[in-house]
Amino acid sequence: MNVTSLFSFTSPAVKRLLGWKQGDEEEKWAEKAVDALVKKLKKKKGAMEELEKALSCPGQPSNCVTIPRSLDGRLQVSHRKGLPHVIYCRVWRWPDLQSHHELKPLECCEFPFGSKQKEVCINPYHYKRVESPVLPPVLVPRHSEYNPQHSLLAQFRNLGQNEPHMPLNATFPDSFQQPNSHPFPHSPNSSYPNSPGSSSSTYPHSPTSSDPGSPFQMPADTPPPAYLPPEDPMTQDGSQPMDTNMMAPPLPSEINRGDVQAVAYEEPKHWCSIVYYELNNRVGEAFHASSTSVLVDGFTDPSNNKNRFCLGLLSNVNRNSTIENTRRHIGKGVHLYYVGGEVYAECLSDSSIFVQSRNCNYHHGFHPTTVCKIPSGCSLKIFNNQEFAQLLAQSVNHGFETVYELTKMCTIRMSFVKGWGAEYHRQDVTSTPCWIEIHLHGPLQWLDKVLTQMGSPHNPISSVS
């Protein structure tokens, strides 16, 4: 037997397990992944049999099949590192699986990846894919008969007047409070202890940052806690979910509840578009994201991959040396995931990224314009469709202007390498060398339909409103 055939030998156990492989996952990579697993499982009595039982009888209950957790939680297979449960779910169930954010362990699993135990379960039938929650339609009054005094416009205007000349800054995860560290401030006039470096006003009625369903305190390779479907009335720690009635003043009695028009959310063909800027100059065409997993990096991509927005391809005659130097440091950039009605940003660059997301700031009780620094290797949830839906449902009862204000939530700004705000010498995002603007199409189109149904505003929208 020559050396080549010796190393290309595939054990019967590996061949047997590969028989259940799904889709067109790379043959050699899948084989190496399964081979590495077999070597680990052979050390445990009954583990191989349990895995084969799970794969051959997917509808039947099965036990956990575990391997030891590595120091960083990841497993290396042929120069590619990944989370073990994601790797084997990809091999045996979902070849298109992109991220750990898409998986949720079943209740029967005793060693789910997120539990941080010494052993981690890789049984692909102990996990399920997160499904996008069905958002209830917004009920828009057919005839606007409420008193304009009930409008929240005054609150938003006051909020705008209280905005600092420069955005406040927060660093992930240091500025993000750990669960249950502060009670929820009920008064819309109270200052928010979460707000970094300031006691200025933040979003009135924003939910507490102790929501256990939020992965903000975890590094990129750690999955968030289990996704909670909307029908589950309890959060993971047994506490009640946030009270949506706290998000806006009570429904004005002038509105006849029966006389409403339902406006449903529809998922668009492209979930977002991304525009690239250098200082205050837009560069190149907008990138329209059809894949739920999008890379924005500093490289060039001759294959014209539809899942990548390569900033290295874009030219600008007005580019100065600072911009050139910054572009060289973008590197792997940012990975954007749209999973289960939530948007995550994972920093793959060696340099930090800086994010201004009003939805994220609302969730954590920060000032609306706060800029959050995401260091290399970390991920942050930057938008939540369900929270947005709850805000929109409340806002329609308080006037056109209040709903219109929510358009600001649907645009996320993100700079590479260089930050901006009170702690940086750059005061505005347009002063940063390289940045992108992300427009969320689903929420924006929903808002547009709601505003169309509402008709004209009581107070004309202007540049100062």
Swiss-Prot record:
InterPro entries registered for this protein in UniProt: Dwarfin, MAD_homology1_Dwarfin-type, MAD_homology_MH1, SMAD-like_dom_sf, SMAD_dom_Dwarfin-type, SMAD_FHA_dom_sf, SMAD_MH1_sf
Keyword Iron recorded: no
Binding-site positions, Zn(2+): C64, C109, C121, H126
Region called L3 loop, residue ranges: 418-428
Positions of region (Disordered): 162-248
Residues with the Phosphothreonine modification: T322
Residues bearing the modification N-acetylmethionine: M1
Annotated phenotype, changing V317D: Reduced trimerization
Modifications the protein undergoes after translation, according to the UniProt entry: Phosphorylation of the C-terminal SVS motif by BMP type 1 receptor kinase activates SMAD1 by promoting dissociation from the receptor and trimerization with SMAD4. Phosphorylation by ERK2 MAP kinase in response to EGF or HGF prevents SMAD1 nuclear accumulation and transcriptional activity in response to BMP. Dephosphorylation, probably by PPM1A, induces its export from the nucleus to the cytoplasm. Dephosphorylation is inhibited by association with EGR1.
UniProt-annotated location(s): Cytoplasm; Nucleus
Any single Gene Ontology cellular-component annotation: chromatin
Residue numbers bearing the Phosphoserine modification: S463, S465
All copies of domain MH1, residue ranges: 12-136
Biased composition (Pro residues): 221-232
Keyword field contains Acetylation: yes
Expression sites (tissue/organ): Ubiquitous. Highest expression seen in the heart and skeletal muscle.
Composition bias type Low complexity, residue spans: 179-210
Domain MH2: 271-465
N-terminal signal peptide: none
Purpose of the protein: Transcriptional modulator that plays a role in various cellular processes, including embryonic development, cell differentiation, and tissue homeostasis. Upon BMP ligand binding to their receptors at the cell surface, is phosphorylated by activated type I BMP receptors (BMPRIs) and associates with SMAD4 to form a heteromeric complex which translocates into the nucleus acting as transcription factor. In turn, the hetero-trimeric complex recognizes cis-regulatory elements containing Smad Binding Elements (SBEs) to modulate the outcome of the signaling network.
Disease: SMAD1 variants may be associated with susceptibility to pulmonary hypertension, a disorder characterized by plexiform lesions of proliferating endothelial cells in pulmonary arterioles. The lesions lead to elevated pulmonary arterial pression, right ventricular failure, and death. The disease can occur from infancy throughout life and it has a mean age at onset of 36 years. Penetrance is reduced. Although familial pulmonary hypertension is rare, cases secondary to known etiologies are more common and include those associated with the appetite-suppressant drugs.
Subunit details: Found in a complex with SMAD4 and YY1. Interacts with HGS, NANOG and ZCCHC12. Upon C-terminus phosphorylation: forms trimers with another SMAD1 and the co-SMAD SMAD4. Interacts with PEBP2-alpha subunit, CREB-binding protein (CBP), p300, SMURF1, SMURF2, USP15 and HOXC8. Associates with ZNF423 or ZNF521 in response to BMP2 leading to activate transcription of BMP target genes. Interacts with SKOR1. Interacts (via MH2 domain) with LEMD3. Binding to LEMD3 results in at least a partial reduction of receptor-mediated phosphorylation.
Protein name: Mothers against decapentaplegic homolog 1
Natural source organism: Homo sapiens
